[in-house]
C-alpha cells in the first residue's frame, strides 16, 4: 500500500511540474516570425535632373523587422530614399542617405534615387533585404 501511495505521489508531482513548465512558455502566436526577401537590385541608369524608382513597390505585413538596402554607383555609394505609400501618395520616410536601414513598420514601400538636383547622370546596382 505504501508503494502505491509513493508511486501516485511521485507521478502527481511530475505531472504538476510538467504542467507548470508548459504554461510558463509563451503562446505560439506571440512569436514574431517575419519572412525576409533578399536579392539584387537590377543595374540601371538615372538621367540628370530625374528621379527613378529602383526597387518596389513592395508590401510589408510584418513591421518589426528591418529593411536593408545597399546601392552603389560607378564612383561609390549612391544616396537613396525610402518612400511609403500614405493617403494615396508617396511620402519619404528617410532622407537621401547611403545604405538606408530601419524598421519602418507595415505598409507599401519603394526605393528611389533622386537625381533632380544633379546635372550628371548616375548608374547604379545594389542589393536588398526586406521583410514581407
Range-by-range predicted roles:
Residues 75-88:
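Short, surface-exposed beta-strand/strand-loop-strand elements in extracellular ectodomains
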Residues 49-50, 58, 107:
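Tight coil/turn sites that cap or link beta-strands
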Residues 1-42, 46-47:
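N-terminal prepro-regions of secreted/extracellular proteins
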Residues 93-105:
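Beta-sandwich interaction modules
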Residues 103-119:
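Noncatalytic modules at the cell exterior or secretory-pathway interfaces
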Residues 55-74, 111-113:
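Hydrophobic beta-strand segments within beta-rich accessory/binding domains
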Residues 42-44, 55-58, 99-102:
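Beta-strand-rich interaction surfaces with strong enrichment in secreted/lumenal proteins
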Residues 118-131:
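Edge beta-strands of jelly-roll/beta-sandwich modules across compartments, strongly enriched
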Amino acid at each position: 500500500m505504501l508503494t502505491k501511495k509513493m508511486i501516485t505521489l511521485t507521478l502527481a508531482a511530475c505531472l504538476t511540474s510538467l504542467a507548470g513548465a508548459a504554461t510558463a512558455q509563451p503562446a505560439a502566436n506571440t512569436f514574431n516570425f517575419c519572412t525576409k526577401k533578399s536579392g539584387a537590385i537590377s543595374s540601371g541608369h538615372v538621367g540628370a535632373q530625374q528621379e527613378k524608382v529602383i526597387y518596389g513597390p513592395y508590401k510589408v505585413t510584418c513591421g518589426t523587422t528591418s529593411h536593408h538596402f545597399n546601392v552603389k554607383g560607378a564612383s561609390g555609394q549612391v544616396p537613396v530614399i525610402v518612400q511609403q505609400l500614405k493617403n494615396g501618395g508617396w511620402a519619404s520616410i528617410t532622407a537621401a542617405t547611403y545604405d538606408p536601414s530601419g524598421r519602418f513598420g507595415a505598409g507599401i514601400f519603394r526605393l528611389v534615387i533622386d537625381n533632380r538636383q544633379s546635372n550628371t547622370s548616375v548608374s547604379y546596382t545594389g542589393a536588398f533585404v526586406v521583410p514581407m
